[in-house]
A protein has these predicted regions:
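C-terminal motif of bacterial Sec signal peptides marking the signal peptidase cleavage site
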Residues: 20-23
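An alpha-helical repeat/solenoid feature that recognizes helix-turn-helix modules
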Residues: 46-69, 91-115, 132-166, 178-218, ...
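Bacterial N-terminal signal peptides that target proteins for export
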Residues: 2-9
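Core helices of alpha-solenoid repeat scaffolds
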Residues: 37, 74, 119-123, 166, ...
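Internal amphipathic alpha-helical repeat/solenoid segments
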Residues: 43-50, 76-95, 126-131
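Terminal, non-catalytic domain-edge segments
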Residues: 27-39, 274, 289-323
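Helix-boundary/low-complexity linker signature
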Residues: 26-28, 38-43, 150-157, 171-175, ...
Length: 323
C-alpha cells in the first residue's frame, strides 16, 4: 500500500507506544503456531520502519484474542485512519482501489462500519468499475474481498461512468483464468501464479453457488496442487517465497480445504511446514529463505497463521471473522 511512509510510521507508533502494545518479542505460547503469530505481531510493532500499514495488524489482533486486547489498539487506529480520511476526502486511492479496499478491511477489523466511518462511505469508490480494472484482476479481486469482509453490499455511486456489481467483478475474474487453471496479474501470462491464484480464490470463495465459479475454483485448486514444490512451498517469479505460501494457505482455509489434504502435501511437507521455515529468530519472516526479515512477508505470514489458528479452534476462517 503506497501510503506516506511517515504517516504509516506515525500511526503505528501511536498504536505501539501510546497504547503500550509492544512486548519486544518476549511473549511466548505453549503452542508453536500461536507463538509464531505472537512473534510476528511483536516484530511488526517493534520494527516500525518495516511496516507497510496497520490494516493487517488490526485483522490479526481482532481475529485472535491472545494477540492483543482490543482496547489497547482500536481507538488509536481509528483515530489515525479518521485523520487520513479527512485529508483525502475518504478516497485513499484515486487510481488504486486496492488501497481503498485494504483500508476498508482494517477499519472493519477494528470494529467500525466502513460504509459510515467518520461521515465517509469508504466502500463507495469500489463501485467504480473502470477504476477498479485499472489494476486488472487485482482491482476486481480486492474489491470483492473488501466488500465481503464486512458483509457490505455494493454501493451505488452516481458519479461513476460504469456502476460496478459484484457479478461484474466475478465475470471479469473468470475471464482471466488461464489454461492451467491458475490466474496471473499479467494479461500475457501463460501460467498461473500462486499468489494471484490464491488471492482470486479468496475473492471467489463466497460465490461457489454459481456453477461457473465452482468449476473455476476446482480448476484453480488443481493448478495449485500441480505447481506446489516438493518441499511444500511455492515459487513466484522464480523465487520460493513466504508470501506465496501465505496466500495459498488463506485460500485453502477460506474454501474449507484442510492443509493436510493429500493434494497439498508433498513428500510429507504441508504448506504451513514450509511457511514456518521463513520465520526468523526475532519473530519476523523473510521474503526468501536466507534474506533479512521483510515487513510484507511478516504481515502475510501472520494473517495466514492466525487464520489457521482460528480454523483449528473451530472458528470461521479469518475473512469470515467480521461478517
Amino acid at each position: 500500500m503506497k501510503t506516506s511512509k511517515v504517516r504509516i510510521i506515525a500511526a503505528v507508533l501511536v498504536l505501539a507506544l501510546v497504547f503500550g502494545l509492544v512486548s519486544c518479542g518476549k511473549r511466548k505460547s505453549d503452542d508453536p503456531i500461536e507463538n509464531a503469530a505472537l512473534g510476528a505481531v511483536d516484530w511488526l510493532y517493534g520494527d516500525v520502519g518495516a511496516v507497510h500499514g496497520a490494516n493487517w495488524l488490526c485483522v490479526a489482533m481482532g481475529a485472535w484474542e491472545g494477540l492483543a486486547p482490543k482496547d489497547k489498539w482500536q481507538e488509536g487506529f481509528a483515530k489515525s485512519v479518521a485523520e487520513a480520511a479527512k485529508e483525502c476526502g475518504g478516497v485513499f486511492g484515486t487510481r488504486k482501489l486496492t488501497d481503498q479496499a485494504k483500508v476498508i478491511i482494517g477499519v472493519t477489523a477494528a470494529g467500525y462500519d466502513a460504509s459510515n466511518f467518520e461521515g465517509y462511505d469508504l466502500t463507495l469508490p469500489l463501485a467504480d468499475y473502470e477504476t477498479a480494472l485499472l489494476q486488472g484482476i487485482n482491482g476486481a479481486s480486492w474489491s470483492l474481498i473488501a466488500l465481503d469482509f464486512g458483509g457490505y453490499e455494493m454501493p451505488e455511486n452516481p458519479d461513476v461512468a460504469v456502476q460496478a456489481t459484484k457479478d461484474m467483478y466475478i465475470d471479469y475474474i473468470l475471464s482471466r483464468q488461464l489454461p492451467d487453471g491458475g490466474f496471473a496479474f499479467s494479461t500475457t501470462a501463460a501460467l498461473g501464479d500462486p499468489d494471484m491464484t490464491g488471492m482470486v480464490l479468496i475473492a471467489l470463495a463466497n460465490y461457489t453457488d454459481r456453477p461457473d465459479v465452482a468449476e473455476a475454483v476446482e480448476r484453480a485448486l488443481v493448478c495449485l496442487s500441480n505447481i506446489q514444490q516438493d518441499d511444500g512451498g511455492y515459487t513466484s517469479y522464480g523465487f520460493e517465497t513466504a508470501e506465496s505460501c501465505a496466500q495459498v494457505i488463506l485460500a485453502l482455509l477460506k474454501l474449507g480445504v484442510p492443509l493436510d489434504d493429500e493434494r497439498f502435501v508433498k513428500n510429507g511437507n504441508t504448506i504451513m511446514d514450509k511457511l514456518l521455515e521463513y520465520r526468523m529468530e526475532d519473530g519476523g519472516f523473510a521474503h526468501v529463505i536466507g534474506d533479512a526479515v521483510n515487513g510484507v512477508a511478516t504481515e502475510q505470514a501472520m494473517i495466514a497463521i492466525v487464520c489457521y489458528l482460528r480454523v483449528n479452534a473451530g472458528m470461521p476462517e479469518i475473512f469470515s471473522a467480521y461478517r
